[in-house]
């Protein structure tokens, strides 16, 4: 009892350490006062956890401080007790014993402790978000769903049925939006809306093309109707030009009249210039009328390398460069228009001693093509057809031996 008399009075539910213990802060020196009973450490530990001993929600997070105790006023304000238990220890010096003795008494607040609690309230920086509760509509979780809000606004059964029908109809479309009636319909699947099929796209394209054709025909009819207006404008131009005497005035008036004329966009009357409509015989007949450039009386033997098809070699009219327009060189995408000249072998030989001057217009990479059939068979000991069937490295080796590479 003496031990308890030495200790100051504490509020119910508070823990205070004993100062008489030989080992300060040991568990055996801790006593608690609860319901007008003094409990030791062992009795305090035997009480079940679900009973609020210290009137704190999380007693396991409370930090044990042997020199300070919590008063009842601090336990009343739950957010402050949470901040104090979860925040680190403050570095401010402890208050005087008189202030603590006055603050520990239940229901009595001294003048020394009053300014501490009322005048300078304890504030700490918030480390969490406080939602705005000034407006009742700010919290979206407390609001009813949209269709229920509409029911509260207009609670008639007709509007309720309309809203339900709208919800059901919108659930049938992707993104709850009806499709555009002007666009082709998409393929409907159970997984994801696919793009429209090619058949639907093709029909839509044909419809648009037909409408464009109709618009073009209308424009052509308008152009035909405006032909008379064009004639009238030209007659006016001639009359105005006949009135002007100076040449400079005539030029200026002519330019102004040409700018004022409407531009005709009729292009269907133009002939087709595509290569699919021109024939090979028409091109050869035109080329035969041109003056012969470098033609010789020697007849070249057409090989598979120099001609795209073997049918040209059998026809006599395609020899001697007449069918060169249709010939395709190997490795080139464009046809060889100009006929290659034929030179003797001695003029085409390339030596390493000095820089040899080749004839003009000679292809340095294909000197063998400028040889005649007799010189070709004499130099390479084979026909041009057999030479064209060889591999590239083999042909280069033969040309090196013949000094044509």
UniProtKB/Swiss-Prot annotation:
Signal peptide stretch: none
Biased composition, class Low complexity, residue ranges: 11-29
Entry's free-text remark on domains: Both the N-terminal core domain and the C-terminal headpiece domain are sufficient for binding to F-actin and necessary for actin bundling activity.
Record protein name field: Dematin
Record carries keyword Glycoprotein: no
Outcome following mutation: residue 333 to A: Reduces interaction with plasmodium berghei 14-3-3 protein. Inhibits phosphorylation and interaction with plasmodium berghei 14-3-3 protein
Stretches with biased composition (Polar residues): 108-123, 276-322
GO biological process: one example: cytoskeleton organization
Self-association state and partner proteins as the record states: Monomeric (isoform 2); under reducing conditions. Self-associates. Exists under oxidizing condition as a trimer of two isoforms 2 and isoform 1 linked by disulfide bonds. Found in a complex with DMTN, F-actin and spectrin. Found in a complex with ADD2, DMTN and SLC2A1. Interacts with F-actin, ITPKB, RASGRF2 and spectrin. Isoform 2 interacts with SLC2A1 (via C-terminus cytoplasmic region). Isoform 1 and isoform 2 interact (phosphorylated form) with plasmodium berghei 14-3-3 protein; the interaction occurs in a PKA-dependent manner.
Tissue: Expressed in platelets (at protein level). Expressed in heart, brain, lung, skeletal muscle, and kidney.
Organism, scientific name: Homo sapiens
Encoding gene per record: DMTN
Residue ranges, compositional bias (Acidic residues): 216-227
Lineage: Eukaryota, Metazoa, Chordata, Craniata, Vertebrata
Compositionally biased region (Basic and acidic residues): 228-242, 252-261
Domain HP residue range list: 337-405
């Amino acid at each position: 009892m003496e031990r308890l008399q030495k200790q100051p009075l504490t509020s119910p539910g508070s823990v205070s350490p004993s100062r008489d213990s030989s080992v300060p802060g040991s568990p055996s020196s801790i006593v608690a006062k609860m319901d007008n009973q003094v409990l030791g450490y062992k009795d305090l530990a035997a009480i079940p956890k679900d009973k609020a001993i210290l009137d704190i929600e999380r007693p396991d997070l409370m930090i044990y401080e042997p020199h300070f105790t919590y008063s009842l006023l601090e336990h009343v304000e739950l957010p402050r007790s949470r901040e104090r238990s979860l925040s680190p220890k403050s570095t401010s010096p402890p208050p005087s014993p008189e202030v603590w003795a006055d603050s520990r008494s239940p229901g009595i607040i001294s003048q020394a402790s009053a300014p501490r609690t009322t005048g300078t309230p304890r504030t700490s920086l918030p480390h969490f978000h406080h939602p705005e509760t000034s407006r009742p509509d700010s919290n979206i979780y407390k609001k009813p769903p949209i269709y229920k809000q509409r029911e509260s606004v207009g609670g008639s059964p007709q509007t309720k049925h309309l809203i339900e029908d709208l919800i059901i109809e919108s659930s049938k479309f992707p993104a709850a939006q009806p499709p555009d009636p002007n666009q082709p319909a998409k393929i409907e699947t159970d997984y994801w809306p696919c793009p429209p099929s090619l058949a639907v796209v093709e029909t839509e394209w044909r419809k648009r093309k037909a409408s464009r054709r109709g618009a073009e025909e209308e424009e052509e009819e308008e152009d035909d109707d405006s032909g008379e207006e064009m004639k009238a404008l030209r007659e006016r131009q001639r009359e105005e030009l006949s009135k002007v005497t100076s040449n400079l005035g005539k030029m200026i008036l002519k330019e102004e009249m040409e700018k004022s004329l409407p531009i005709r966009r009729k292009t269907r009357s133009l002939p087709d210039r595509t290569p699919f409509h021109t024939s090979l015989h028409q091109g050869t007949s035109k080329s035969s009328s041109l003056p012969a450039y470098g033609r010789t009386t020697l007849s070249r033997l057409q090989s598979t390398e120099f001609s795209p098809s073997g049918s040209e070699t059998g026809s006599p009219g395609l020899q001697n460069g007449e069918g060169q327009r249709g010939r395709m060189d190997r490795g080139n995408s464009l046809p060889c228009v100009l006929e290659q000249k034929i030179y003797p072998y001695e003029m085409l030989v390339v030596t390493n001693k000095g820089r040899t001057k080749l004839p003009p217009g000679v292809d340095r990479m294909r000197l063998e093509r400028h040889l005649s059939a007799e010189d070709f068979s004499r130099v390479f000991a084979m026909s041009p057809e057999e030479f064209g069937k060889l591999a590239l490295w083999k042909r280069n080796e033969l040309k090196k031996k013949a000094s044509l590479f």
